């Protein structure tokens, strides 16, 4: 079915491409204007925000194709450096919700004496992580991190775009601290305050999450409150590329 849909999309794209680029853009803009004027301004804004979200999905799909199955954001935002720079060589590192293993791979390559384990619940992502060109100090395992984690102690726990996918975040973080017993927890989450349109999206009732599987996209205040309630102290934090990057320690360490 997917192959058929892609074939149909390819055919339609070729037909659409026959039209001059300027005409295509004017037609699309005209449709957006009409959609924004369907109903009152609040409804029109909600409609346009829905289109913007769909366009973001299309852009991300093309970005993955452009990047050869790896999203260019890894290269352009250099967020991997945030994790690499905070992992000492020789450390035991647990990457929770490692996805395709991109961050874990960067850390393992840069810190050859470290031992890095990535855990992931999604079988497809895990398989891709395991079959990539991985250094010998990196391994992957299947795990539902909300139910069981590899026991510690781990020197560093990495949570890159994980917390926003969880409803019981504070309980999860407490479990991580109790089971993994880390000295340091490195966290990356999307920031709600990245754009004024996020607040307007919420105000008009449009979706303001960057992923339909997100339960939250933190404000700075929410992130500070949740980490503190879980028993973490923020040692250093930066906001960049619409995200919060935080270097945390368990309280008492």
What do these predicted ranges mean?
Residues 162:
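Hydrophobic adenine-recognition pocket in adenosine-nucleotide-binding enzymes
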């Amino acid at each position: 079915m997917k192959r058929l849909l892609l074939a149909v999309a390819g055919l339609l794209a070729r037909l659409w491409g026959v039209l001059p680029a300027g005409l295509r853009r004017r037609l699309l803009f005209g449709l957006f204007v009409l959609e924004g004027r369907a109903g009152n301004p609040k409804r029109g804004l909600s409609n346009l925000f829905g289109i913007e979200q769909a366009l973001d999905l299309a852009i991300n799909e093309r970005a993955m194709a452009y990047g050869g199955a790896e999203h260019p954001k890894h290269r352009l935002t250099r967020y991997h450096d945030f994790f690499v720079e905070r992992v000492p060589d020789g450390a035991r590192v647990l990457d929770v919700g490692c996805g395709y293993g991109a961050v874990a791979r960067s850390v393992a390559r840069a810190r050859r004496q470290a031992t890095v384990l990535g855990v992931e619940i999604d079988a497809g992502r895990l398989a891709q992580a395991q079959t990539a060109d991985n250094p010998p100090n990196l391994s992957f395992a299947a795990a539902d991190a909300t139910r069981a984690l590899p026991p510690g102690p781990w020197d560093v726990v990495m949570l890159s775009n994980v917390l926003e996918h969880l409803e019981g975040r504070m309980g999860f973080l407490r479990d991580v601290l109790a089971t993994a017993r880390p000295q340091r927890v490195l966290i990356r989450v999307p920031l709600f305050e990245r754009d004024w349109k996020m607040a307007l999206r919420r105000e008009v009732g449009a979706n303001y999450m960057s992923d339909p599987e997100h339960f939250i996209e933190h404000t700075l205040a929410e992130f500070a409150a949740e980490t503190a309630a879980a028993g973490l102290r923020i040692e250093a934090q930066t906001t960049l590329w619409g995200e919060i990057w935080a270097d945390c320690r368990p309280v008492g360490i």
